[in-house]
Amino acid sequence: MNIFDRKINFDALFKFSHITPSTQQHLKKVYASFALCMFVAAAGAYIHVVTHFIQAGLLSALGSLGLMIWLMATPHSHETEQKRLGLLAGFAFLTGVGLGPALDLCIAINPSILPTAFMGTAMIFTCFTLSALYARRRSYLFLGGILMSAMSLMLLSSLGNLFFGSVWLFQANLYMGLVVMCGFVLFDTQLIIEKAENGDKDYIWHCVDLFLDFVTLFRKLMMILAMNEKDKKKKK
């Protein structure tokens, strides 16, 4: 029998039998909201970089933080759903604006960094998300303690580097941060599944977790590519 004659069963490929139908519906809402966040964040970044109508700064950072706190403080219900979606969109927009200075820096070094970083982030995020969805339930939840310890270590080293100014330590933090965020994609995806299985259907807040994972991954990868490109130019 010719192996190329075999048909691929796509229904079986995307079948998550270990996840209940209600949780699968919840995940659809989470990723639909995530897609909305990506679109709105892209609009925010575009406005900063191209139109300069709104510039990233202290006000945009405080606005983003304020909207996130407001969203967190607003209880999830059918009555507040539209309001919370509006808060989510506002948060995503200001987060996109906040990426502006990093985008400007990368464009100045090499504009091709941006599509490369975005495609790389999308591939990493998709692969680790699928790994978490296909894996046995709760199999990655043990990562929580490890990831928080790693984040604490990175924070301490970053604070220490304010005094030492070590380029090597800065680079190590970037690469370690990239690995840690990959772990958070696994952890957060499975945590969302477990929360949904236990009755927590707040898909808007669950979307925030994944959106922040993606944005942080993108920022780390973008900075790594920019740093490597700058080193190449110095060698030339």
UniProtKB/Swiss-Prot annotation:
GO-annotated cellular components: endoplasmic reticulum membrane
Membrane topology: Multi-pass membrane protein
Domain of life of the source: Eukaryota
Keyword Transmembrane found: yes
Pfam families the record matches: Bax1-I
Signal peptide extent: none
GO biological processes: apoptotic process; autophagy; cellular response to unfolded protein; negative regulation of apoptotic signaling pathway
Segments on the Lumenal side according to the record's topology features: 51-52, 108-112, 161-166
Subcellular location(s) of the protein: Endoplasmic reticulum membrane
InterPro entries, per the entry: Bax_inhbtr1_CS, Bax_inhibitor_1-related
Post-translational modifications reported in the UniProt record: Ubiquitinated by BFAR, leading to proteasomal degradation.
Quaternary structure, from the entry: Interacts with BCL2 and BCL2L1. Interacts with ERN1.
Alphabetical list of PANTHER family matching this protein: BAX INHIBITOR 1 (PTHR23291:SF32), BAX INHIBITOR-RELATED (PTHR23291)
Described purpose of this protein according to its UniProt entry: Endoplasmic reticulum (ER)-resident protein that confers cellular protection as an anti-apoptotic protein by limiting multiple stress-inducing pathways surrounding the endoplasmic reticulum and mitochondria. Inhibits the activities of the key sensor for the endoplasmic reticulum unfolded protein response IRE1alpha/ERN1 both directly and by blocking BAX/BAK binding. Modulates ER calcium homeostasis by acting as a calcium-leak channel. Negatively regulates autophagy and autophagosome formation, especially during periods of nutrient deprivation, and reduces cell survival during starvation.
Listed name of the protein: Bax inhibitor 1
